[in-house]
């Protein structure tokens, strides 16, 4: 799977004392330290075989004395468009993103099966041509189709094997995609979690990401106009 990434620029107000920034592996991270939690985030554009997204890598550290449940379903995002409108973007939960992947993979398998079926369907058939001449010299060509049942059986077996192989590859692909994608998690005191989510991409100026934790919303604004 090919992935293309494009980094973004964080927008900060001068009097915001809750934010610290640093570069990690070439990406700009912003951390908000407030209400007993440190929430870090970086975002960038990505493009893979399944579409174009804003990807957010999220870090959450619980500095409270009690456990808190982090629910990715509560993460929201909106975009200030070039026309000045606020547009609500879809933040994919793990379940929604896996469903999108499965749908794309089912289409790929269906198209692959169709093309394999065409090849298998024509297997076993061969064509021969014979030419004869009448008494006045006119040529007549006879076309004869031959069918080899064993060749057709072998081709269908090969087609089925190709589909099974592709299906197994996609199962492994899904397992890889699920690693690190944020899910509902209990964050215990002094524990931290890190993962990522994808947001449906749309062109605009400012991307705002809101991460609610324990009744407080941690917001981050990113310049995505470039």
Predicted feature locations:
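Sec/Tat signal peptide C-region and signal peptidase I cleavage site
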Residues: 3-7
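Conserved functional micro-motifs across diverse proteins
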Residues: 8-226
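Hydrophobic, Leu/Ile/Phe/Ala-enriched alpha-helical segments that form helix-helix packing faces
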Residues: 1-2, 64
């Amino acid at each position: 799977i090919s992935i293309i990434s494009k980094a973004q620029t964080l927008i900060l107000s001068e009097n915001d004392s809750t934010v610290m920034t640093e570069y990690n592996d070439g990406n700009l991270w912003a951390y908000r330290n407030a209400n007993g939690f440190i929430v870090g985030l970086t975002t960038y554009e990505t493009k893979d075989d399944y579409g174009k997204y804003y990807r957010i890598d999220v870090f959450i550290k619980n500095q409270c004395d009690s456990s808190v449940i982090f629910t990715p379903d509560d993460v929201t995002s909106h975009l200030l468009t070039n026309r000045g409108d606020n547009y609500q973007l879809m933040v994919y939960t793990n379940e929604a993103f896996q469903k999108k992947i499965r749908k794309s993979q089912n289409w790929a398998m269906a198209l692959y099966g169709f093309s394999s079926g065409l090849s298998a369907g024509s297997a076993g058939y061969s064509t021969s041509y014979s030419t004869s001449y009448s008494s006045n010299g006119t040529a007549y060509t006879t076309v004869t189709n031959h069918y080899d049942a064993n060749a057709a059986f072998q081709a269908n077996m090969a087609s089925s094997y190709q589909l099974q192989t592709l299906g197994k590859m996609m199962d492994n692909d899904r397992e890889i995609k699920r690693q690190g994608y944020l899910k509902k998690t209990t964050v215990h005191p002094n524990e931290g979690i890190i993962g990522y989510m994808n947001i449906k991409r749309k062109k605009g100026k400012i991307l705002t990401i809101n991460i609610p934790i324990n009744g407080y919303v941690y917001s981050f604004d990113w310049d995505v106009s470039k």
